[in-house]
C-alpha cells in the first residue's frame, strides 16, 4: 500500500451525527427560527462540518448536525456563534433540548469525511445570501425499528432504495440519508436489546416530487420487503418548514457521495 493511501486512511474520522430536538415556546417560534438559521449558516463554515440542517414541525425544531470526528464536534461547541445561539435561545425553549446520536449507513462514514455543504459564492469570494422562503424543498424523517437478526438485509435493501430514489427520473429527491441510532446506557431497554432503530432523512424538491417518490415501484418494493423485518410500525415526521438551508442547491451531495452512488448502483 502506498504511503499516500495510508495517509488517506489515517485521515478518515468517525463521523459524529447528532439530532438535537428543541421545543420553542408558542410565542417564540419566529425568534427561534432566526437564531437557529444564523447559527446553522455559521456552522457550515466550520472546516470539519459536513452538514448542519435545521427543520421545524409546529414548535419543534430538529437540528441535523454532522461533524467529521469528535474533536470537530467539541470545537463547534467552543465557537462564538454556537455560544451566542445557546445563550439567545435558552429563554425561548419550553423544555430542555434533547439529543440523539447516530452512525452513518448511507452515505458511508468515508463518504461523509469528504463532503461539505456546497456554498454559493460570488466573483469576490463572498457567500451569496438567499432570500428566506425562496426554497421549495420539503423534508421528512422516517423512524424504523428493525429486528437485529434482519439488520444486514434491511440495510442492503434500504441502500438500494436510497440509490434508486436519488436516481429518480424527475430528479426530485435531493437527499436520502440513512442513519443508525446509537443508544446510550440510559436509553438501553429490552426493546433495544432485540432491535435496532434507523432514521431516513429524506428531502424532496417539492411536495409533488415527494408524492412521485412514494408512488415509485422501488419505494413500493422496499415497503413490501422490509415489512416483515420491522419490530413495530414505522413512524415519521413531516416538517412544516426547512429553516436551513434556505438555498435548495445546498442540499446537493459532494462528489464523493455521487461516486459512491454510482459504484453501489
Language model features with spans:
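Flexible, substrate/cofactor-facing loop regions flanked by secondary structure
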Residues: 125-165
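Generic structural motif
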Residues: 25-27, 104-105, 147-149, 207, ...
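Long tandem-repeat architecture
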Residues: 30-33, 50, 62, 68, ...
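Short, well-ordered beta-strand segments in beta-rich or mixed alpha/beta enzyme
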Residues: 15-23, 53-77, 136-145, 177-217
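Glycine-rich beta-strand-turn "strand-cap" elements at beta-sheet edges
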Residues: 2-14, 53-59, 84-136, 174-195, ...
